[in-house]
Design a protein with these regions (language model features):
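Short, Lys/Arg-enriched N-terminal segments with co-localized hydrophobic residues
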Residues: 1-8
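Catalytic beta-strand/loop module used to bind and position nucleotide/cofactor moieties
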Residues: 128
Length: 231
């Protein structure tokens, strides 16, 4: 169905399923799948992320051929930055971080706390942590002398919790639009779910309007069967 209104996208899970998942998990994805067979990952990245922070990951076969998946991420739930031996938290990572505890210790606690459902309909990457650990992070576990001069001024490490994703399945010519929700003890589930749904619609709108290339919603079993004529 071409040019279907964005509000007709099938959002998954529904709220009742979302609330049930939130009872046992600390991060719950909300997503919708639409058709998108007229795009390239680089063009989609330019539209969806633009000049803001984001990432593009490609799956590759044998090191030299593009494969099935492209992952475009933006607006992380939270980011952990290590600089000069101190940690800074931007956003909501779901746990309290001590600025002095070190990146490796913080990551160990984050991974122990992170629980997201494994659902068959989700793409292989739909959440988790992404970023980099610089060489000097090793100084948290090894006492190395002669700290080199910091001539770049970059953080020693930056790790983000994936927030919004557009996952392109080139084999099926579909894109999964996804927003992750961090679940805390005081999370208003209805408000969090509604926010995630709004993020998905915004993600679709940002990806569709920059060029004349429609996102098409998937057919539904309740759709009327069109009449067929022959000549």
């Amino acid at each position: 169905r071409r040019d279907a209104p964005l509000h007709l996208m099938r959002i998954r899970p529904d709220f009742d399923e979302f609330a049930a998942l939130a009872a046992d998990h600390t991060v719950v994805p909300v997503w919708a799948e639409v058709l998108a067979d007229l795009t390239t990952p680089v063009a989609a990245f330019a539209r969806v992320v633009g000049d803001n922070e984001g990432f593009l990951l490609e799956s590759v076969d044998n090191g030299d051929r593009w494969s099935r998946w492209s992952f475009i991420g933006r607006r992380p739930q939270g980011t952990l930055v290590s600089k000069d031996g101190r940690l800074q938290v931007i956003g909501d990572l779901g746990i309290d971080i001590d600025p002095e505890e070190g990146m490796l210790t913080a990551l160990e606690r984050l991974l122990a706390h992170y629980r997201s459902p494994e659902l068959d309909d989700l793409p292989p990457l739909h959440g988790g942590l992404i970023g980099y650990l610089g060489y000097d992070v090793v100084r948290e576990v090894e006492h190395l002398p002669n700290v080199p001069a910091d001539d770049l001024g970059h953080p020693d490490a930056v790790i983000s919790m994936i927030g919004e994703l557009a996952v392109y399945d080139h084999w099926r010519q579909r894109v999964t639009l996804l927003a992750n929700v961090v679940i805390n003890d005081d999370t208003d589930l209805q408000a969090a779910y509604d926010t995630a749904v709004a993020q998905i619609h915004q993600l679709a709108d940002d990806g569709a309007r920059a060029i004349d290339e429609p996102l098409m919603s998937l057919p539904d079993p309740s759709d009327p069967i069109p009449e067929v004529t022959s000549t």
